[in-house]
């Protein structure tokens, strides 16, 4: 289990104060969901309680990506390489990442590509932790992502849009524990 706390202010009305508040309430690992482009942001996220940060490979040149990856690791944080194409996944692997998140939402148009994870995940080594971001709204979606190799999913939209957040969360968590879920085998 992991909590992804949205701290990006402009599109999601999140803040580091929100993450600090969540950090006080739970002991689960937390990822600071923001667009990280500067080492200062990594230090800031760590100070506010983040255990991990996302690095969006598609908007960073290779040198910047690797420098931010090194900075996160030097602070004892996990860096999640967020990719949208097989080429971005290759760049992340060349840098030596251990966690790759395939984001099904396009960065520029905010369109959903429901096949992104199924297209990219098979090319990732088995030792890499694979996360599916976006497109998981139902227990069936979760099981489909797991059958394509997902070790974890981010289902924020489904949970936050639900009339009953607790029920939606329980439904997805139960699906992840179901014997039919390939990750449970």
Question: What does each model-found stretch correspond to?
Answer:
Residues 1-80, 88-91, 99, 117-120:
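N-terminal active-site wall of soluble small-molecule enzyme domains
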Residues 7, 44-64, 101-111, 148-169:
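Glycine-rich phosphate-binding active-site loops on the catalytic face of alpha/beta enzymes
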Residues 14-18, 64, 112-116, 141, ...:
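Residues at alpha-helix caps and immediate loop-helix transition turns in enzyme cores, especially N-
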Residues 30, 37-49, 84-96, 132-155, ...:
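Catalytic cores of alpha/beta
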Residues 75, 126-127, 149:
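Structured helix-beta-strand junction loops
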Residues 84-129, 135-145, 162-163:
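Catalytic core of soluble alpha/beta enzymes
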Residues 114, 119-123, 146, 160-185:
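C-terminal helical cap(s) of enzyme catalytic domains, especially alpha/beta-barrels
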């Amino acid at each position: 289990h992991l909590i992804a706390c949205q701290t990006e202010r402009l599109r999601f009305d999140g803040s580091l104060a929100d993450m600090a508040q969540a950090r006080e309430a739970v002991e689960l690992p937390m990822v600071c969901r923001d667009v990280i482009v500067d080492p200062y942001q990594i230090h800031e996220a760590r100070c506010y309680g983040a255990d991990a940060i996302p690095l969006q490979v598609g908007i960073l040149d290779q040198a910047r990506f690797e420098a931010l990856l090194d900075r996160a690791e030097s602070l004892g944080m996990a860096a999640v390489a967020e990719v949208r194409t097989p080429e971005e996944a290759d760049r992340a692997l060349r840098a030596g990442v251990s966690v790759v998140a395939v984001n099904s939402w396009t960065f520029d148009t905010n369109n959903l590509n429901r096949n992104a994870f199924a297209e990219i995940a098979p090319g990732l080594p088995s030792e890499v932790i694979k996360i599916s971001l976006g497109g998981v709204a139902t227990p069936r979606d979760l099981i489909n992502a797991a059958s394509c190799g997902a070790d974890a999913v981010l289902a924020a939209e489904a949970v936050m849009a639900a009339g009953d957040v607790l029920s939606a969360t329980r439904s997805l968590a139960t699906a992840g524990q179901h014997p039919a879920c390939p990750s449970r085998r």
